[in-house]
Amino acid sequence: MRRFWSFYQNESYQVGCSGKTVYIYDKAGNELAKFRDIPYAYTAAFMPGKNIIAVKSTEGRLGFYDLDSLCLLKRITITRIGAQDEGFCFSPDGSFFYNIEKPITSLRTQLGVYETNTFTKVSTLFAEDVRTVLRHLEFDEKTGTCYLLGYVRNDMGVRDRDFIAIFNTESQTLQDIHFISQKQYDYLEIYKHWELSGFTEKTLEWCFCDLDEKLSLKEVYEAAGS
């Protein structure tokens, strides 16, 4: 099997992203389909409990695919600004998809929330906050708590303080912000990028640092608050 930028599998399928093409395989490694609906498709994620994947393009597009029927469910263009490599994930129950986006400029971020029946955006959050920059997010599968990694700019627009916060999905606000060191932030930013790839060797080669310590946002958040 070819070397992919990202690779994922569940109980039924395997998915590999080359950038140009999304390859679908069965569990035995037999190729079932190749999708080329969105360019620069480097990362993907399985919806919990279903054979549906979200594919994210660094060009600012999303694609949602049903692997049982091997078809594109929906294609969304958020922006044509490049370098869209921030974090994304499904909620633990699969009812929502969360995507960190940069629709206006590479210096501004927002959090897009999509319901997963029709993959329609239901909320755009933090778009007016010019000081807070979002980078990665993760859910605790047991508690449903969402942790968000980011940083705050100072009055000059320069990165000032790095943080992990609880994102309250009901009130759609950041709560209980814990500030972390620049070293912790830099490691987590790169580690989470590698994690989004499914920990592939090809992506690791471009991380240019040792990622020997397995860390979650939850672990660092709890340690910062102790």
Residue ranges and their predicted role:
Residues 1, 30-36, 71-79, 120-127, ...:
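A short beta-strand motif characteristic of beta-propeller blades
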Residues 2-9, 37-48, 81-90, 129-141, ...:
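Repeated scaffold domains used in trafficking and secretory/extracellular systems
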Residues 10, 18-20, 28, 49, ...:
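Short loop/turn segments that connect beta-strands within the blades of beta-propeller domains
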Residues 18, 57, 99-102, 148-152, ...:
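Recurrent small/Gly-Pro-centered beta-turn motifs in extracellular repeat architectures
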Residues 19-23, 60-65, 106-112, 155-165, ...:
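Structural motif
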Residues 26-30, 67-70, 115-119, 168-172, ...:
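Short loop/turn segments that connect beta-strands within beta-propeller blades
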Residues 189-226:
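Blade-level signature of beta-propeller repeat domains, shared across WD40, Kelch, NHL, RCC1
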